[in-house]
């Protein structure tokens, strides 16, 4: 019996030969058995999340759904075969993921080849493909890394590290061939560490679904818009991808660098060597030459380089041996648009050949190790795909805060709030207190402009004073102003007309009355100790005038102009 691996390779080769008939794109990639199983796990977890459950899928459910899916797609399932719960939604999600990634699985390849009705004989049946995908006891395991005769922990770790590094190298090459492959991008988005963890991948995934674009196209368009779009086309400040601008920029620029190597190098052998060397140096940057990871990356790069050169030799032999329907005057590649139109085309074909060989590998023996990867064990920043596609928990604020916080908040709410005394103007007695509440917020746009005082003066309550008697004539007003002036000449002043002191005090205006009260109440607090003039108490009799010189001198010192007492007490603080 023929080897199933060779039959799968022949099936894929025929698909590449007839791709214009069976596929929409030449760069359509193929999912192998392991990638099919991982994609089904993601589809099952996504359906569980849509039904109100957690984003999770048990190993038994995945394996049961896997066998059911393979049988139904190959048409080998019986009518009364029991199907898992929500099987229709799981299969729909699985096929949608393949379609958006511009990819096909092995069963899709078999179905498309079967519908062609080719005259070429194909001995590979659906039963053999079912056995190849579900029963792997007849296969000897990993052909690239032989099993060590004396098992030990260190050798097992080296084999596991090499397998992970090989997956990272192939994912970068897959992304160069098919930029729509979200499965490949998820494996290398944070390899090496770029700060693009689960949160960044979740934001990228949500934006991709909203815009109906691939993950790589979303990241590329975001970086290009910021770099080349200008202010008018720049993303909004609320864009969730702005938080990951640095990491996305590093990732996009590195892929651009790989595309430049692919397009500017005409020799496919040199291009393959440069691609693998660039990826290797990017992964081991900052590590010493004797580091185990550096040595493992070097070994994987050399192995892939040797395989690429062997594939190039096979392609060149096939081209020169069989050339039907090709004109002998066929132009060379470098003669078309100076070698830029078809630059890298030969290398793309070689990379497709390499990826097809990987897709034809038999499934892994240890399904638990494949599906249940260690979340804490990350190599070069890579995490398991299931962990990456699971959205991080969002804080919705529905859970109550701790009891101590709530008690402290209630106590702070009941505490009386201290209000700062307002410094009122000297004319505040002429306005109503209700006007103070109408102060607008933009009167003090910043805290630095708010008037402050270390020891504010006490608030003065306005007192309404009314004149008991009107002034008899204007001469009395002029005389009163002369007595309160500080520039009066005492030697030539003469005597004052007979006027009772009580009547003069009662006939002062309302503003002067308030200033005198403020001076008498705050004299001890705001004024420094000084020599105080003795104020003589006038008698109640109207016939006793204040005509002495000492009385005129003391009254001239004590009497101030309107508002002077308030300003003096304010600036003495």
Swiss-Prot record:
GO biological process: DNA repair; negative regulation of double-strand break repair via homologous recombination
One GO cellular component term noted in the UniProt record for this chain: cytoplasm
Primary localization class, coarse: cytoplasm
Domain of life: Eukaryota
Database matches in Gene3D superfamilies: PCRA, domain 4
Subcellular localization, as worded in the UniProt entry: Cytoplasm; Nucleus
GO MF term list: DNA binding
SS bonds (residue pairs): none
Keywords, sorted A to Z: Cytoplasm, DNA damage, DNA repair, DNA-binding, Nucleus
Entry-linked SUPFAM superfamilies: P-loop containing nucleoside triphosphate hydrolases (SSF52540)
Region (Disordered): 492-532
Bias (Polar residues): 515-527
Function as written in the Swiss-Prot or TrEMBL entry: Required to suppress inappropriate homologous recombination, thereby playing a central role DNA repair and in the maintenance of genomic stability.
Family classification: Belongs to the PARI family.
Protein name in UniProt: PCNA-interacting partner
Provenance organism: Xenopus tropicalis (Western clawed frog)
